[in-house]
């Protein structure tokens, strides 16, 4: 059996390809010779849309793949927390023994790092907890709330250090002439400069090492939280470098460098608190992700076969997780199952190439065809009308035309309506008597098409296909 097309709807190639895929996927090979789908797919144009090779990208398997990296990420956070605790104690003791404001300020910064690392670890654990009934969209917001609390603490700590540093700086500057004339300075006791320098240099080295370790792990897992924590380690290294300048100034007798370095460190802390708080507030109010950050995801979508375009790509963050919404455009004449398959493959490709995406909501739109109507009667369906009722009315009209005018010539087997750009397009499959010639069928089909377009003003195009199936 087969199908003879009297009027081919655009695009022809994809219509045939759709039938071909459905026959290859769901029909056994032994029945291919008698299948109407096989005959229709025997076109010389080879379809290019193949789903059978891609079905192995299962959604559950994907999540199992990233369970082990989650454990590795937790180890990285624990390492950072341990290092911050050790550095906080070492800097506090060194700053007290050496009398260095810069080192004490850096120690206070390290104490805030301990809290930050602890919250990051807890947030990382909470963010990786599976979804449940109470949290159907995951637990990423817990991480955001923790970051907002940390930003408030950073602002308070930085402001206190700045106040203390300004007080010491004013004292140092007012006492500077007397220090110069007396030849005496209130710098670090010469019994402790090596201790101060050693601890400060060790802090810089450890923090820079943590930066590279965390950065590599973050890039490997695609974790935004780990990447942010890595840059936080680097900012700590820079603040320790500033403290090193203050220690050097105190050793040389330049008293104002020590509180000045503490003031610079406090500025860095306040800046980090402002940035963290701003980002957290944006996440809590579901601010949109910048378009340039979504461009790689857009390219991934457009590379999928069967996707003719995408629009309304938008995203929001919940901690280190990214949630997406996107509309993809597919062939308007593909079946529901094929269009769904295209959407699922887009989802799998996004999860495969962008692990930071926790969930993506895909809406499937048909590609609009460019066609012109011959009369003004073929206007778009008004928004107030019920589309389902309109389609039922059109189907009833078509049935009446065939039963009243063509009952002895053609019999309707199936009516498939398409709604494109507020226009109704009809695909009608008919059967003919065995005694009727093909030429007579073509004449009858042309007559039916004209009558349908005349009786149904909402119909813009009609395609009548002849089925040779005897059943």
Swiss-Prot record:
It comes from the Eukaryota. Gene3D superfamilies: Cation efflux protein transmembrane domain, Cation efflux protein, cytoplasmic domain. GO terms for molecular function: monoatomic cation transmembrane transporter activity. It is a multi-pass membrane protein. Keywords: Membrane, Transmembrane, Transmembrane helix, Transport, Vacuole. Its main location: membrane. Residues 100-101, 166-192, 258-423 are vacuolar. InterPro entries: Cation_efflux, Cation_efflux_CTD, Cation_efflux_CTD_sf, Cation_efflux_TMD_sf, CDF_Transporter. The keyword Transmembrane helix applies. The chain crosses the membrane at residues 79-99, 102-122, 145-165, 193-213, 237-257, 424-444. It is found in: Vacuole membrane. SUPFAM superfamilies: Cation efflux protein cytoplasmic domain-like, Cation efflux protein transmembrane domain-like. Disulfide bonds: none annotated. Residues 1-78, 123-144, 214-236, 445-471 are cytoplasmic. GO terms for cellular component: vacuolar membrane. Belongs to the cation diffusion facilitator (CDF) transporter (TC 2.A.4) family. Involved in sequestration of excess metal in the cytoplasm into vacuoles to maintain metal homeostasis. This is Metal tolerance protein C1. The gene is MTPC1.
């Amino acid at each position: 059996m087969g199908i003879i097309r009297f009027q081919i709807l655009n695009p022809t190639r994809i219509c045939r390809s759709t039938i071909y895929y459905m026959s290859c996927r769901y029909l056994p090979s032994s029945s291919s010779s008698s299948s109407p789908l096989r005959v229709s797919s025997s076109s010389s144009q080879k379809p290019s849309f193949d789903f059978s090779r891609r079905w192995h990208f299962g959604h559950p398997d994907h999540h199992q793949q990233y369970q082990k990296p989650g454990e590795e990420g937790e180890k990285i956070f624990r390492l950072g927390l341990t290092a911050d605790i050790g550095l906080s104690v070492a800097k506090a003791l060194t700053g007290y023994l050496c009398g260095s404001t810069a080192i004490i300020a850096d120690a206070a910064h390290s104490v805030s790092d301990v809290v930050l690392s602890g919250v990051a670890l807890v947030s990382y654990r909470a963010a990786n907890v599976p979804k449940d009934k109470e949290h159907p969209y995951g637990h990423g917001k817990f991480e955001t709330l923790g970051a907002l609390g940390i930003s408030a603490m950073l602002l308070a700590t930085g402001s206190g250090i700045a106040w203390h540093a300004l007080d010491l700086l004013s004292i140092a500057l007012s006492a500077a002439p007397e220090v110069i004339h007396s030849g005496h300075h209130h710098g670090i006791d010469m019994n402790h400069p090596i201790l101060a320098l050693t601890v400060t240099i060790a802090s810089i080295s450890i923090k820079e090492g943590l930066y590279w370790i965390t950065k590599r792990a973050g890039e490997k897992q695609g974790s935004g939280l780990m990447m942010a924590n890595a840059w936080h380690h680097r900012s700590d290294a820079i603040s320790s470098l500033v403290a090193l300048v203050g220690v050097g100034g105190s050793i040389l007798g330049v008293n104002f460098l020590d509180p000045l370095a503490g003031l610079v460190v406090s500025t860095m802390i306040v800046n980090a608190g402002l940035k963290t708080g701003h980002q957290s507030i944006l996440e809590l109010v579901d601010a949109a992700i910048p378009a340039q950050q979504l461009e790689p995801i857009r390219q991934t979508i457009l590379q999928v076969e069967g996707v003719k375009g995408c629009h309304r790509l938008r995203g929001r963050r919940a901690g280190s997780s990214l949630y997406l919404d996107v509309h993809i455009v597919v062939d308007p004449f593909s079946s529901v199952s094929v269009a769904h398959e295209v959407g699922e493959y887009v989802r799998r490709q996004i999860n495969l190439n962008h692990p930071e995406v926790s969930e993506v909501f895909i809406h499937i739109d048909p590609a609009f065809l460019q066609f012109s109507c011959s009369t003004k009667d073929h206007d778009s369906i008004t928004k107030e009308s019920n589309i389902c009722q309109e389609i039922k009315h059109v189907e009833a009209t078509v049935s009446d035309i065939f039963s009243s005018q063509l009952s002895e010539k053609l019999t309707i087997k199936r009516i498939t309506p398409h709604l494109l750009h507020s226009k109704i397009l009809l695909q009608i499959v008919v059967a003919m008597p065995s005694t009727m010639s093909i030429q007579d069928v073509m004449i009858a089909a042309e007559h039916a098409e004209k009558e349908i377009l005349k009786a149904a003003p909402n119909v813009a195009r009609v395609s009548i296909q002849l089925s040779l199936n005897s059943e």
